[in-house]
Curated annotation (Swiss-Prot):
Ion channel inhibitor. Residues 25-52 form a propeptide. The keyword Transcription does not apply. Belongs to the neurotoxin 10 (Hwtx-1) family. 51 (Hntx-8) subfamily. Hntx-8 sub-subfamily. Disulfide bonds join C54-C67, C61-C72, C66-C79. This is U3-theraphotoxin-Hhn1h. It comes from the Eukaryota. One of its GO terms (cellular component) is extracellular region. The presence of a 'disulfide through disulfide knot' structurally defines this protein as a knottin.
Amino acid sequence: MVNMKASMFLTFAGLVLLFVVCYASESEEKEFPKEMLSSIFAVDNDSKQEERDCVGYMRECKEKLCCSGYVCSSRWKWCVLPAPWRR
């Protein structure tokens, strides 16, 4: 009877330990994407502060030229991707 109680206690303690380890690793994994996104947006904000000579996709292109890879739409005056069906 004592051996059965001891084995049940050890099994229960092992399951609790497994739960704690899994929870800790999962919480670390949840923090990793948040850190990556914050670092990406921090870099992105720094690049937005620089003044550019061209404008990007779906930006108004009346005064400034579109960046490479885009053309100014004659109809909407926005920078768009060049396509064969556009004139």
